Amino acid sequence: MFGSSNPFGQSSGTSPFGSQSLFGQTSNTSSNNPFAPATPFGTSAPFAAQSGSSIFGSTSTGVFGAPQTSSPFASTPTFGASSSPAFGNSTPAFGASPASSPFGGSSGFGQKPLGFSTPQSNPFGNSTQQSQPAFGNTSFGSSTPFGATNTPAFGAPSTPSFGATSTPSFGASSTPAFGATNTPAFGASNSPSFGATNTPAFGASPTPAFGSTGTTFGNTGFGSGGAFGASNTPAFGASGTPAFGASGTPAFGASSTPAFGASSTPAFGASSTPAFGGSSTPSFGASNTSSFSFGSSPAFGQSTSAFGSSAFGSTPSPFGGAQASTPTFGGSGFGQSTFGGQQGGSRAVPYAPTVEADTGTGTQPAGKLESISAMPAYKEKNYEELRWEDYQRGDKGGPLPAGQSPGNAGFGISPSQPNPFSPSPAFGQTSANPTNPFSSSTSTNPFAPQTPTIASSSFGTATSNFGSSPFGVTSSSNLFGSGSSTTTSVFGSSSAFGTTTPSPLFGSSSTPGFGSSSSIFGSAPGQGATPAFGNSQPSTLFNSTPSTGQTGSAFGQTGSAFGQFGQSSAPAFGQNSIFNKPSTGFGNMFSSSSTLTTSSSSPFGQTMPAGVTPFQSAQPGQASNGFGFNNFGQNQAANTTGNAGGLGIFGQGNFGQSPAPLNSVVLQPVAVTNPFGTLPAMPQISINQGGNSPSIQYGISSMPVVDKPAPVRISSLLTSRHLLHRRVRLPARKYRPGENGPKVPFFTDDEESSSTPKADALFIPRENPRALVIRPVQQWSSRDKSILPKEQRPTAPLHDNGKSPDMATDAANHDRNGNGELGATGERIHTSVNANQKPNGTTRSDQASEKERPYKTLSGHRAGEAAIVYEHGADIEALMPKLRQSDYFTEPRIQELAAKERADPGYCRRVRDFVVGRHGYGSIKFMGETDVRRLDLESLVQFNTREVIVYMDESKKPAVGQGLNKPAEVTLLNIKCIDKKTGKQFTEGERVEKYKMMLKKKAEAQGAEFVSFDPVKGEWKFRVEHFSSYKLGDEDEEDGV
């Protein structure tokens, strides 16, 4: 072979590796073997043969493990053979027949597989076909090469070399190779090779093999009459009584009788399911009888018993088959399918953003869909279906019961996760969404997180439990050496408690070990990593330094797991204590430093602002782990008293809730950052300034609702006074039509007026906050139809000079209404004329002006009550003109009039150049001083298109010079010179001059004086001496133009 004159697999006299035959072929003596001593490696019997012969090749034509007379490696017993029994045998080789075996039979490793009594002499091949060579008929490529029919080499016909002459080599034409028809090589039909029969190779049906039935690569060699694990005489330890878990016929993944270590009588933890793609009988380690298992009988991670397989709800699968029917360790066992059936709702799988496919470009990461319906576990349901499932389960929000995790799975595992011991097939092949405790791929598995790389075996996965690797193991912690990915596991996984970042539980990152690695005892989270319990400070369980290079000892570091009892970021034994003096490492346990510049840590890990005790809240975003963690990664706001705003143990936010802001005692659970995470058990008590009412979240679509703040009490000096007397309403009056007197309206204008405060009301202080506020009598002048008897007239108190203020008739008389009943105010007026006269007895006339009457007195109150009302401060609004329509305006504005009236009483009697207008129509400026008190401008002034009317009712028009019937300057808008045929506006030229002349004539015709005309703006100004109606009609334009 290597170095010999013969081709690969041909017979020769000498072999560089110690025998004339190749792997399992005829050999003369061990002297031809340069690597073999006089005594073989253990015995003269081959590797698990019946008699003393070669282990990897013998004198006769024995298969891999067939009886030989001499061994290329030794002459005496093989590994664990006769004279000195090895590995539990008496005389036989590794798995030979005569003596008993500790694995249950007389064979060693698979002879009588795991407790079965059928004797078999050859564990890795029968003794019946011992005349056949190992990898081929006589030599590796002699009579029946790898894939050929009778004699060729690796797919060649007669006696070719490695794939040589007459008949095609590896899958060639006449004797086809790889899956060909007539006499194919490598898995063909007639004399199939590499797992081929008349039915297909890989997983074929009737008599499959790892090659085929009667030809190459394990045809009669390598331990059977068939190929590698073929039909009649099974391959690689397969026989009538199976070898290393093998059985009668099937090939590598074949159908009827399993290949490569499969059997009907199971071996090393096999089951009844087939091999890799096989149908009925399982493969590598598949059986029906229990062996190495934690449950009843399945294989290592099999259907009915293996650790977490069917005991916790898994389905049958071969050594690596990922059956995704029932969850694994924690999938069903801890709250899902097997114990209690399928559990639905929004808590079945912890919420995590779904990465949107085909969105990441270059350096930009892929986008994420922030929707629970986008998750693979919920993609068939919408929000309301999940909500309905929550209600069916009785889940209406709030935290889970004690000891129950957010997901249905045991430690955060998705409920649809399969085999516990292998998420992917046994030989590194991947499977669909396998979440396996000991070899997980892409799911959140408690004992091994992420997808193993190719060649990662079942027992070894990416990273491990506490941190990214199992107790200091590096990230490629495959048990059998295969590489794997480097994501975290259940106690640091990204989905155990609703967290979304792949960071471990106690703050460790994805690097392993006790120092430079991520484990339970060690390092801090990497950048962007948020641990499962949400400590956002880079603090670890046992005071390891953060990954950003922060240093600190066990008692002086910022934010370690158990606390730094109140330490600040200062050194360990010198930070400020509660009394502003240095303390030891455990100082400040119940109160932190009162300085304003440093932040300290609470006794249980939370970093706090200065002056906040450790049982108070931390700064926003400074959550920590240990006993003070903000449980699920939510930020905490600062408080001033009480605990951290939550109901946690020592101040942590309860299940991801951040406390309310400062200084008001309200019940307020705040928003959960994870909308589908755990919800608060009850509203949190916090101190807050603005009164925010609680917002309770239930279900999926609950969002925080913050109501308006509670109204703040306003000082009485800023209270608008009109609110007080607006609440005073007169009782409804009875109407008797039979009595004399005019009919009055049911409500007067002032009672129907709006109570909206004027703009100046909040800015003008009240003159006397204790004064009794009533409406002046003048507002009800429409009811003054008869005069009260003189003995019921109210009188005013006399001043010191003996003179009483004026009591005008319309102001002093709270008279009877039309039906003779006293009004509500008039009934309380019972004063005599001389009640309050001074000794000089002088009074003034009742016809005195209202301006000189600043006070009124109302009697009938109990002694000592305030009965003096300052009329001017109380009745500013009543004096103001009324103008409710929004498109009308006055200059000065009514608010300014009120302010000036307060500052200068009587100002509204003499407003200079008062303007009333309507936006887009025009305006009127009344020349000189105008008395605007109590003017109902809406009924007096009306603007229409190119028209203004003052005093529409001629009967109500006062004499010229009084009221608004006085000289004024009128401005009308939209007076433009337009060509009516084309719609073009003329701003200059002859047509404009003609139009201007027409306006002058129109003004003169109405008794007005033309002032100006602006053809660009369309403004026409003219002056009038008195008012009626002034307009410009369309016919006037036609005449003028």
From Swiss-Prot:
<feature type="repeat" description="40">
    <location>
        <begin position="329"/>
        <end position="330"/>
    </location>
</feature>
<feature type="repeat" description="23">
    <location>
        <begin position="202"/>
        <end position="203"/>
    </location>
</feature>
<feature type="repeat" description="17">
    <location>
        <begin position="154"/>
        <end position="155"/>
    </location>
</feature>
<feature type="region of interest" description="Disordered">
    <location>
        <begin position="315"/>
        <end position="347"/>
    </location>
</feature>
<feature type="repeat" description="48">
    <location>
        <begin position="480"/>
        <end position="481"/>
    </location>
</feature>
<feature type="repeat" description="45">
    <location>
        <begin position="459"/>
        <end position="460"/>
    </location>
</feature>
<feature type="domain" description="Peptidase S59">
    <location>
        <begin position="885"/>
        <end position="1027"/>
    </location>
</feature>
<feature type="repeat" description="54">
    <location>
        <begin position="533"/>
        <end position="534"/>
    </location>
</feature>
<feature type="repeat" description="44">
    <location>
        <begin position="427"/>
        <end position="428"/>
    </location>
</feature>
<feature type="repeat" description="27">
    <location>
        <begin position="228"/>
        <end position="229"/>
    </location>
</feature>
<feature type="compositionally biased region" description="Low complexity">
    <location>
        <begin position="430"/>
        <end position="447"/>
    </location>
</feature>
<feature type="repeat" description="58">
    <location>
        <begin position="573"/>
        <end position="574"/>
    </location>
</feature>
<dbReference type="GO" id="GO:1902446">
    <property type="term" value="P:regulation of shade avoidance"/>
</dbReference>
<feature type="repeat" description="34">
    <location>
        <begin position="284"/>
        <end position="285"/>
    </location>
</feature>
<feature type="repeat" description="65">
    <location>
        <begin position="676"/>
        <end position="677"/>
    </location>
</feature>
<feature type="repeat" description="49">
    <location>
        <begin position="491"/>
        <end position="492"/>
    </location>
</feature>
<feature type="repeat" description="7">
    <location>
        <begin position="64"/>
        <end position="65"/>
    </location>
</feature>
<keyword id="KW-0813">Transport</keyword>
<feature type="repeat" description="5">
    <location>
        <begin position="41"/>
        <end position="42"/>
    </location>
</feature>
<feature type="repeat" description="36">
    <location>
        <begin position="300"/>
        <end position="301"/>
    </location>
</feature>
<dbReference type="GO" id="GO:0015031">
    <property type="term" value="P:protein transport"/>
</dbReference>
<dbReference type="GO" id="GO:0031965">
    <property type="term" value="C:nuclear membrane"/>
</dbReference>
<keyword id="KW-0811">Translocation</keyword>
<dbReference type="Pfam" id="PF04096">
    <property type="entry name" value="Nucleoporin2"/>
</dbReference>
<feature type="repeat" description="56">
    <location>
        <begin position="562"/>
        <end position="563"/>
    </location>
</feature>
<feature type="repeat" description="28">
    <location>
        <begin position="236"/>
        <end position="237"/>
    </location>
</feature>
<feature type="repeat" description="42">
    <location>
        <begin position="339"/>
        <end position="340"/>
    </location>
</feature>
<feature type="compositionally biased region" description="Basic and acidic residues">
    <location>
        <begin position="782"/>
        <end position="793"/>
    </location>
</feature>
<feature type="repeat" description="61">
    <location>
        <begin position="627"/>
        <end position="628"/>
    </location>
</feature>
<dbReference type="GO" id="GO:0005737">
    <property type="term" value="C:cytoplasm"/>
</dbReference>
<feature type="repeat" description="60">
    <location>
        <begin position="604"/>
        <end position="605"/>
    </location>
</feature>
<feature type="region of interest" description="Disordered">
    <location>
        <begin position="1"/>
        <end position="44"/>
    </location>
</feature>
<feature type="region of interest" description="Disordered">
    <location>
        <begin position="517"/>
        <end position="560"/>
    </location>
</feature>
<feature type="repeat" description="19">
    <location>
        <begin position="170"/>
        <end position="171"/>
    </location>
</feature>
<feature type="repeat" description="47">
    <location>
        <begin position="471"/>
        <end position="472"/>
    </location>
</feature>
<dbReference type="InterPro" id="IPR036903">
    <property type="entry name" value="Nup98_auto-Pept-S59_dom_sf"/>
</dbReference>
<dbReference type="GO" id="GO:0017056">
    <property type="term" value="F:structural constituent of nuclear pore"/>
</dbReference>
<keyword id="KW-0509">mRNA transport</keyword>
<keyword id="KW-0539">Nucleus</keyword>
<feature type="repeat" description="9">
    <location>
        <begin position="87"/>
        <end position="88"/>
    </location>
</feature>
<feature type="repeat" description="11">
    <location>
        <begin position="103"/>
        <end position="104"/>
    </location>
</feature>
<feature type="repeat" description="51">
    <location>
        <begin position="506"/>
        <end position="507"/>
    </location>
</feature>
